[in-house]
Amino acid sequence: MIPGGGQPNMQQLLQQAQKMQQDLAKAQEELARTEVDGQAGGGLVKATVTGSGELRGLVIDPKAVDPEDTETLADLVVAAVQAANENAQNLQQQKLGPLAQGMGGGGSGIPGLPF
């Protein structure tokens, strides 16, 4: 309902929905191009992912490589990738959160949004 008791203008609502859809698509494209980093072991292992969570790079400092202890290296790689993905999720919330609120939700239940 519109203040004053009038009915909502369907054309206006449709235009608003189309604009929100375009804004969402633009933000998702921007996220796919943006890269964020995560690290573990004090920077011995660094992972780079896109804002949408795609792993793009992994850098391992030679100091982290111990042939006798590959398990620790594996743990550092997992931790770095998880940190990068957490940073990507934070970026997603920054970019897409305001759009989700504009669609009447707090970010929950909207297809394509991970939060």
Curated annotation (Swiss-Prot):
<dbReference type="GO" id="GO:0005829">
    <property type="term" value="C:cytosol"/>
</dbReference>
<dbReference type="GO" id="GO:0003677">
    <property type="term" value="F:DNA binding"/>
</dbReference>
<protein>
    <recommendedName>
        <fullName>Nucleoid-associated protein SCO3619</fullName>
    </recommendedName>
</protein>
<keyword id="KW-0963">Cytoplasm</keyword>
<dbReference type="GO" id="GO:0043590">
    <property type="term" value="C:bacterial nucleoid"/>
</dbReference>
<dbReference type="InterPro" id="IPR004401">
    <property type="entry name" value="YbaB/EbfC"/>
</dbReference>
<keyword id="KW-0238">DNA-binding</keyword>
<comment type="function">
    <text>Binds to DNA and alters its conformation. May be involved in regulation of gene expression, nucleoid organization and DNA protection.</text>
</comment>
<dbReference type="Pfam" id="PF02575">
    <property type="entry name" value="YbaB_DNA_bd"/>
</dbReference>
<comment type="subunit">
    <text>Homodimer.</text>
</comment>
<dbReference type="InterPro" id="IPR036894">
    <property type="entry name" value="YbaB-like_sf"/>
</dbReference>
<comment type="similarity">
    <text>Belongs to the YbaB/EbfC family.</text>
</comment>
